[in-house]
Swiss-Prot record:
It comes from Chlorobaculum tepidum (strain ATCC 49652 / DSM 12025 / NBRC 103806 / TLS). One of its GO terms (biological process) is mismatch repair. It comes from the Bacteria. Residues 416-436 are annotated as: Disordered. GO terms for molecular function: ATP binding; ATP hydrolysis activity; ATP-dependent DNA damage sensor activity; mismatched DNA binding. InterPro entries: DNA_mismatch_repair_CS (IPR014762), DNA_mismatch_repair_MutL (IPR020667), DNA_mismatch_S5_2-like (IPR013507), HATPase_C_sf (IPR036890), MutL/Mlh/PMS (IPR002099), MutL/Mlh/Pms-like (IPR038973), MutL_C (IPR014790), MutL_C_dimsub (IPR042120). Belongs to the DNA mismatch repair MutL/HexB family. This is DNA mismatch repair protein MutL. GO terms for cellular component: mismatch repair complex.
Length: 624
């Protein structure tokens, strides 16, 4: 065995580069962090050939003295910390002193820098870690670093780079995170000589709309919270604005982008049933806390952190997010693209880069209350101009669209039971007189269309009733006040072994809900009573369907028992698509929907309500 010897710096730097510089996006991240730490107010990012040919970052930061230039490309040389205690009070993004040494060892590297008060700057070049003597140079105040031919001397690393589209996607996501977290900085990005964006203002919503589509920024929920321990601020997406979890959830600790599973789970759980399966909400959250309470020196990439008290962080983030999303107006607003929409400057048409911009209609980012939309609905009775021909509102038309005026036998009687109060509109107004009720129709025995003050409201009748039944089931089980209707002829059901096992698991909760079921030998049970919402003759089918859905939810979603049972119960008992409703039934369903705590989404996260504004209709008909 050979004797132990210290590795030459050039070899050590290449080894270090394996962790610090994983791909071109890593270079972009490290150089931008240096620019921000230098106090830059303007940063330009220039990319060529997805970073293979060129990554260049230009800033107007403080720059460096000529004596510091050589030190900047040495390992473990930094201006950001000087002693071990500094690691507990980090106020900068960089601190390890590895980045420039690692980057310059695997590229053709050029650095130009000048302090604002100096007449000349300094130029330094490095060819794969072989550093040339720095030279005086004319340059702008600040620093410009150009990294060419990345991994030219490490063929294995260059070989394993992905396609240009994939590598540029990573670069773009990296830059986007900085652009969103540092709105006070002017950002410009060039890709293969094309300008992708140039943000001169500090409007975060404007930047979000650029990246995610027109109106996206205005449709977010703003979050702010502060106490003695930490601050929380940022933006959250509505359930209809689902995203890819990996790239469209941003968490910053003291403005440092981090990856943290606990924070992802806290946000996901705070949304709860507002999300459909395998969906994740958009999140841009900034957490501020004492640097001594978080360790960022976990990995050279500086994306992972360790909290001193992770449970306390979660116990603050979870309720803040939950409170924000539960008080927001989640009704979707329909949006239709204009026939000749202009191309947005800076879109990148790459196969693996998401360049298609979604359209989100502009509506207030501040949360509207349930009462706001309900008042809008009730006010719809007075919106029609008095000069409109009566023929347009002939009663025969309303009758045909609403599919009759009599309750159909298939609809649960409980829907019409006046036991639930109308939602409080919050203004003490008297109810609308029956002859002045808002116009309402049923479309294809599937959707309920209502005239509201600002346009139209469309409700999915099945998921609306699901929401009503779900909250009623939760309340009944929590209050331990079951309401059971005894069957004149009890029904015996033979269950499969797995069904009987599930039945035994949930039998106590079934009783709380209003099911009176007792074992009847072997794998059989006898249904003697059911809740009022269960349709006559469907008792056995409903029970078996509930057991099947409960089992599926338990396996996939890991739901709490009571929540799972309420979801299964509401889904199987709600009025179905294709079921005719009378005008009276539709009005009662709407009133009960708006009496729930969250009328905008069903228990599984699907939207219940869509609004179509008069302004949108005017645009569709070319009136604006």
């Amino acid at each position: 065995m050979a004797s132990i010897a210290r590795l030459p710096d050039i070899v050590a730097n290449k080894i270090s580069a394996g962790e610090v510089v994983q791909r071109p996006a890593s270079v972009v991240k490290e150089l931008i962090e240096n620019s921000i730490d230098a106090g830059a107010s303007r940063i330009t990012v220039i990319i060529k050939d997805a970073g293979r040919q060129l990554v260049q970052i230009i800033d107007n930061g403080c720059g460096m003295e000529s004596d510091d230039v050589l030190l900047s490309v040495e390992r473990f040389a930094t201006s950001k910390i000087s002693e071990v205690d500094d690691l507990d009070a980090l106020r900068t993004l960089g601190f390890r002193g590895e980045a420039l040494a690692s980057i310059s060892s695997v590229s053709h590297f050029e650095l130009k820098t000048r302090k604002a008060g100096n007449s000349l700057g300094t130029l330094l070049r490095s060819d794969g870690g072989v550093i040339e003597t720095p030279q005086p140079a004319q340059c702008e105040p600040g620093t410009s670093i150009a990294v060419r031919n990345l991994f030219f001397n490490v063929p294995a690393r260059r070989k394993f780079l992905k396609s240009n589209a994939t590598e540029f996607k990573h670069i773009h996501e990296t830059v986007k995170a900085f652009v969103l977290s540092y709105p006070e900085i002017e950002w410009r990005m060039m890709n293969d000589d094309e300008e992708l964006f140039h943000f001169r203002t500090s409007d975060v919503r404007e930047r979000l709309s650029h990246f995610y589509g027109e109106g996206f920024g205005e449709s977010l929920i703003e979050v702010t919270e502060e106490n003695d321990y930490m601050t929380i601020g940022g933006y959250l997406g509505k359930p209809g604005m689902m995203v890819r979890q990996k790239y469209d959830q941003y968490f910053f600790i003291n403005r440092r982008l981090i990856q943290n599973r606990m924070l992802v789970q806290a946000v996901q759980q705070a949304y709860g049933e507002l999300l459909e399966e395998r969906q994740s909400p958009f999140a841009l959250l900034f957490l501020g806390l004492d640097p001594s309470l978080v360790d960022v020196n976990v990995h050279p990439a500086k994306l992972e952190v360790r909290f001193e008290d992770e449970k306390s962080i979660r116990s603050m983030v979870y309720p803040v997010v939950k409170r924000a999303v539960r008080t927001a107006d989640f009704s979707s607003e329909a949006s239709f693209a204009a026939p000749s929409a202009p191309t947005v400057s800076g879109e990148v048409d790459l196969p693996e880069v998401s360049s298609r911009k979604l359209s989100y209609s502009s509506f207030s980012g501040k949360a509207s209350t349930t009462g706001d939309l309900y008042r809008n609905y009730r006010a719809g009775a007075f919106s029609a101009p008095s000069s409109v021909s009566p023929m347009l509102f002939d009663s025969s038309l309303e009758t045909s669209l609403s599919a009759g005026s009599r309750p159909t036998p298939m609809v649960q009687e409980s829907l019409l039971t006046p036991s639930v109060d109308q939602p409080d509109t919050g203004d003490g107004e008297n109810p609308v007189a029956p002859e002045k009720e808002p116009k309402i129709w049923q479309l294809h025995n599937k959707y309920i269309i209502c005239q509201i003050k600002t346009g139209l409201m469309i409700i999915d009748q099945h998921v609306a009733h699901e929401r009503v039944l779900y909250e009623r089931a939760i309340d009944i089980m929590n209050e331990a006040a079951p309401n059971s209707q005894q069957l004149l002829f009890p029904q015996k059901i033979d269950l499969k072994p797995w069904q009987y096992e599930v039945f035994e698991e949930i039998s106590d909760e079934l009783y709380r809900l209003g099911f009176n079921i007792r074992p009847f030998g072997g794998m059989s049970v006898m249904i003697e009573g059911v809740p009022p919402d269960v349709r006559d003759g469907a008792e056995a089918t409903i029970l078996q369907d509930m057991i099947a859905e409960y089992q599926e939810n338990a396996a996939k979603l890991k739901l709490e028992k009571r929540d799972n049972l309420a979801k299964s119960y509401s889904c199987r008992n709600a009025i179905m698509t294709g079921q005719k409703l009378s005008v009276e039934e539709m009005r009662m369903l709407i009133d009960r929907l708006f009496a729930t705590r969250m009328p905008y989404v069903c228990p599984h996260g699907r939207p219940v309500i869509i609004r179509l504004s008069l302004g949108e209709l005017d645009r569709m008909f070319g009136r604006t």
